[in-house]
Amino acid sequence: PYKMKVNERGVSIMNEREKTIRLWFDMWLYQKDMGIDDIFTEDVLYTESWCPQYSNRKTVKHWFQEWNTRGKVVIWEIRQFFHKDNQTIVEWYFKNEMNNGDIEEFDGVSLVEWTEDNKIKALKEFGCNRNTYNPYQESDIPQFRN
């Protein structure tokens, strides 16, 4: 039978990890560092869905602070979590509004890798455009959008 792993305080490890991910998303929504040092390892590897990659916590903090001077995350909604060993996948919907008027929104997932003490040592985001369509709707020859 499956036995839920718990930490020394009796809190399920899955719940603790979900709480950490929610805190990270909340930091973006509130534009406030509420514990970046507490949730990421010093040598974290963070990869955004569109290629930027940050190879330590200091750079993640700089990116967080600098990005929030240019825009605001208005929605970062968690849809579901999946857990396996030292990894978690979280599915989400994201929307931001930049100071220049640009608005971005997309669906995504993050693959999170944890240390033994439940700090994030790697996080890789994957994004999916919400403007989907069927290229075969009108014919057997695909009609792709530009």
Locate the predicted segments by residue.
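A beta-strand edge to alpha-helix "cap/lid" segment located at domain peripheries
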Residues: 10-13, 62-146
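A solvent-exposed, acidic/Ser-Thr-rich amphipathic alpha-helical stretch
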Residues: 15-16, 20, 33-86
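Alpha-helix C-capping/helix-to-loop hinge sites
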Residues: 24-27, 47, 96
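Sequence-level detector for tyrosine residue identity
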Residues: 2, 30, 46, 54, ...
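Generic secretory/membrane-interface signal
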Residues: 1-2, 27, 37, 85, ...
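Acidic surface patches and DE-rich sequence motifs
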Residues: 7, 41, 48, 98, ...
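Short, low-complexity N-terminal intrinsically disordered segments enriched in polar/charged residues
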Residues: 2-34, 38, 42, 141-146
